[in-house]
Amino acid sequence: VCREGDITDLKERIIETSLVLFEKHGFHGVTVNDIVRESGTSKGGFYHHFHSKDELLFVIHDYFISYVLTKAQEANATSQTPTEQLQKIITSFVKVFDLYKPHLTVFYQESTYLKPQYEKAIKVKRDSYKNVLFQVLREGMASGEFRNELPVEITGMSILGMVNWTHKWYQKEGKYTIEEIADIYVDLVLQSLLTEEKKRSSTYRAYFLSKSAASHKKNNNEFCTGQTNQSV
């Protein structure tokens, strides 16, 4: 009899194995037999967890999308101000590129192969995440924290685009930790978004990079910013 922990471990082993194989050979270059052989399981074990290879690809995508959506909803429930909520949303979004880097690599390589029903399910979660972000921006503008002359949609999509591009250059062994990168993004966004009055408040300045930290980063900056494939 399989215990719950054994079943969970088997599912994770199948996912981890498929991530390596999909990244190396592509979605269509890998068969269920390949996954079964490399993960040391059986076809019965595979089909106990996944109806098909297509569902496995969906689960890989769903892992990190569900993570950022849950974190955004938690930020909404636990934050005192829109600024705090936005800081938490950006930070959790950035961290996904460290926590789920293999999943994201496969996502960007193989997302075109998602079946329509799975693509629709992913889109629902992505839209929900986007709506949470847009609502935070609206609330921040209504409360007087954020500049209300900025269009919500363009501002929100700019934040999403900036953070999404992290997958192009982030490396775990790079100069900056994922936490430092998150702090830099938060500073960039809030410096642009907060009203001048709020930026003068010590409460809101606490979200900015300290001068000593900024100086340290500047002195240690050795990478060429003109190369988009340069790891940081």
Predicted segment positions?
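Short helix-capping/turn signature of helix-turn-helix
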Residues: 50, 109-114
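Amphipathic alpha-helical packing segments from all-alpha helical-bundle domains
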Residues: 66-69, 73, 117-143, 153-157, ...
